Design a protein with these regions (language model features):
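Extended, non-globular alpha-helical segments
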Residues: 19-20, 27-36, 90, 107
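Catalytic glycan-binding domains that act on GlcNAc-containing polysaccharides
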Residues: 48-218
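Hydrophobic membrane-insertion alpha-helices, especially the h-region
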Residues: 31-48
Length: 218
């Protein structure tokens, strides 16, 4: 009787241990699945959060303000709005009251240039530092230079370094082979300027940007 009981006890013990091992395997499997699911969710959330953070950083680095003024006066002068946006980014980074040694405003106009082109536009009582006025005059100046040189890069060089310098460079075979386009710009600042404006054009065509209300930014 004792032997029979002992045999049954061992059988029950083995069955219990097998059930225990199965429960432990199921538990480990469930824990593994939960861990994988948690990792997946964290990675997914990180990707989404990272994307949104990247977009926010992009918006900060590449903002657009006064967009309706830019669109209006770019269209009035047959200019690519992205060109105007890129130029303003390089000139003032959309700071309306930005000033350098000689120029001011969003498109960094000198008082002399603003006065010359304001007359051509029929403006009498004006403030060239006003955002709308600055963009209006600046777009007209840029369009005039593109018309004069029939080349955007040459026009950008003239916008930065002045028409007199560019005209002299075009006459120099070291800088121009045809007298119309510049294959080398002797001023390093102007070379960098033209390069950066072109880079910004491509960036703004692909980046999500802030479209700010004009009056809000004034």
């Amino acid at each position: 009787m004792l032997k029979t009981y002992t045999t049954k006890s061992r059988i029950f013990q083995r069955q219990y241990e097998r059930r225990k091992r199965r429960r432990e395997r199921r538990k480990r499997l469930i824990c593994t699945i939960l861990a994988i699911a948690t990792i997946f969710l964290l990675v997914y959330a990180g990707c989404i959060g990272g994307k949104k953070l990247g977009e926010k950083i992009s918006e900060i680095r590449y903002p657009v303000a006064y967009s309706s003024y830019i669109t209006e006066y770019a269209n009035d002068n047959n200019l690519d709005p992205y060109l105007v946006i890129a130029l303003i980014k390089q000139e003032s980074n959309f700071v309306a009251d930005a000033r350098s040694e000689y120029a001011g405003g969003l498109m960094q106009l000198t008082e002399v240039t603003a006065e010359e082109y304001a007359k051509k536009l029929g403006l009498t009582d004006y403030n060239y530092m006003d955002p709308e006025t600055n963009i209006k005059i600046g777009c007209y100046v840029l369009a005039s230079m593109i018309k004069k040189y029939d080349n955007i890069d040459t026009a950008l060089a003239a916008y930065n370094a002045g028409v007199g310098n560019v005209d002299n460079w075009l006459k120099n075979p070291d800088y121009s082979s045809d007298g119309k386009t510049l294959y080398y710009i002797p001023f390093s600042e102007t070379r960098h300027y033209v390069k950066k404006v072109n880079q910004y054009i491509e960036i703004y065509k692909t980046q999500a940007v802030i479209q700010s209300d004009n009056r809000k930014d004034e």
